[in-house]
């Protein structure tokens, strides 16, 4: 026997002193701390199919989907693994068998750690896949074989590496599908026909399988919970509403009904009951189904008189302006501890703060319950066509073939500094490989304080910005976010971000002092200007959105344009404050060239002149 052969034989001898060690931590205990949705979810999703069938594409899309819904997972890709763990293996039958065995063992460890492990390997031979299944089953771990099925000609047409062409030319030997067989699975858990289905459809087929097997909660598949009465039940519910006692609600309350009914506050089914209210007040989250970010209370205040009148009723109608809007069911009344609420949400109880003033003047009781909303809330102000629901926004993005959606929340007119940030974000997304990034320009449309520019004027100004080409109309959606404004700084900015996440945004631009305002008495910033961005980067439950920090933009006097501020060239920049901008507009003067699109500036001056006339 040669020395090399002898050494190889000796290395293959198994040690007799190796004993498998049992973990001290159980899978259930591990599942409690892995991810933000409690429960052990460890399993392996084994994607098999020809090269070019779509395994890697589906694997990474499934990974992105699960992570965005707080399900911990990891994708093992065939090419990636051969760069490291299996770099010493070739493509002989023996090496292929060992490649799959190693992957199965690694996948088992990932699954045992509580992750959904997604593997994307050709794995052409049935016996190797069966061995991978046995490795998992012997460890008591679920294993799901997914056949990614695409005709050979389709796979060849997708072959960006040119491997099929080289195999047909004889340059690559033993290539699966050409001169090496692929043994199709006989009884896979799912078959994905990638020539007939979209990537999204394939992902949802796998998610449905994981739900059926109790790996993924059913609650995550329906991302948006609308509270409208189904059309086939509407007549019956309307008739019922006519027989019920009613509670008159304010315009502010109606705005919150709109927010709830359209699904912006998913998974809330109505105004918060005390349990939900306490979770939000003390943890900034809802905790009944994992950790769901919810930083602001969405509550319905009522007077002591209305509480006395209605507390014996399990259900009653909410009415506004004499119109029955919704039925509130399984009502629960609890004390409205206003000072505590304001302290926790705003960090102050100063009644000169405009929203705190409204809270302090509202009812002494809160009522929570499930809502059945009779119809979509419309304001008939000429702007309803911009009030797109989360589902409508998702559909709009789908029609635009968006592969990234970046949201910009605003309650002020758009100047070229804002536009620079949005343009720069789009540029960065394109550099990262996205093909069709879409901007969601999403002005807040609910209640705002008296000195803010009203919604109708802001919408005219935004339209002028698009008309002048400062932002690209073809890749921009302008829609109205129906929420009232709280001016609650870092607490509120989480709500702004999370609601856009619900609507499909996966990038969120956060600015300086988001949702902030000057302290009503000291006139200094009520919140530290950088805290909003810092809090968003740490906030729990915002797993499917990436925070894009707001770079400081100012007017560059040399360039005569808005530019990103460089402290080394401080003297070149002019910081044009909102106060100065409003003063110029009131006096009919123009700002420096390049500060704002001329047509957009004219809208602003027209608004302030209208105030002077009135």
Curated annotation (Swiss-Prot):
Binding site for ATP 1: 52-57, 197
One Gene Ontology term of the molecular function aspect: sulfate adenylyltransferase (ATP) activity
Region (Adenylyl-sulfate kinase), start-end ranges: 1-215
Residues bound to ATP 2: 409-412, 511-515, 553
Enzyme class: transferase
Signal peptide (UniProt feature, chain positions): none
Tissue expression notes: Expressed in cartilage and adrenal gland.
Disease: Brachyolmia type 4 with mild epiphyseal and metaphyseal changes: A form of brachyolmia, a clinically and genetically heterogeneous skeletal dysplasia primarily affecting the spine and characterized by a short trunk, short stature, and platyspondyly. BCYM4 is an autosomal recessive form with mild epiphyseal and metaphyseal changes. Clinical features include short stature evidenced at birth, short and bowed lower limbs, mild brachydactyly, kyphoscoliosis, abnormal gait, enlarged knee joints.
Name of the protein described by the UniProt record: Bifunctional 3'-phosphoadenosine 5'-phosphosulfate synthase 2
Organism: Homo sapiens (Human)
Gene symbol of the encoding locus: PAPSS2
